Amino acid sequence: MHFSTLFGAAATAALAGSTNASPLARRQVPVGTPILQCTQPGLVALTYDDGPFTFTPQLLDILKQNDVRATFFVNGNNWANIEAGSNPDTIRRMRADGHLVGSHTYAHPDLNTLSSADRISQMRHVEEATRRIDGFAPKYMRAPYLSCDAGCQGDLGGLGYHIIDTNLDTKDYENNKPETTHLSAEKFNNELSADVGANSYIVLSHDVHEQTVVSLTQKLIDTLKSKGYRAVTVGECLGDAPENWYKA
């Protein structure tokens, strides 16, 4: 189940309607309401789900080489355990490099299949892990499978979460082979409008897929820059100052 685009329009309207606010410091990002796009045109938020994983450090290198900040929606224990091996160092590096770290739940369940108590537990477990790793807890999240009904949205809103959807899915998980990754790059190019003054995008990819890291990401960056877009974190995309990206 995909979030309704109606929620995206409502969230954008709520963000845009903030009065007497500076572009960054005072804009209020809605909680408990799925958000599909940025609050001003010309911005692209590259987002990566399911990590950290083997390929994530290389992705961080590529982003740094291109002077690009991105957003990582991390799991606690999915492809890898967030607190095992070098993963804590990877999380700390994400933040040190200026990226936004959000939650993708602890174990990647479909939140619509869980009770309220279990949904809350999934989110709290990630918060506890990230506090142990680097002393922070996310305020941004993306639901696994983009699946979050009204009850789920209510629970996440009660926890103070900004729910991030997407309006451009690269489908990289379908094209994780050297001979097919170009299909995701072409999809991105085709769906990224040339009308920079009227469009913005929250782009969905996954740092657990090798071709996304070694091939696709550079193509995404080159394409968005060639069309005149600027790559930003989801927080900047929504006019949210960095000091507001995490819970106290």
Swiss-Prot record:
Co(2+) binds at D50, H104, H108. This is Chitin deacetylase. Its EC number is 3.5.1.41. Optimum pH is 8. Optimum pH is 8.5. Optimum pH is 11-12. Recombinant chitin deacetylase could be used to produce chitosan oligomers or polymers from chitin, this reaction is currently achieved by thermochemical alkaline deacetylation. Due to its properties, chitosan has many biological and industrial applications such as the production of films or fibers. Acetate binds at D49, Y145. InterPro entries: Glyco_hydro/deAcase_b/a-brl, NODB_dom.
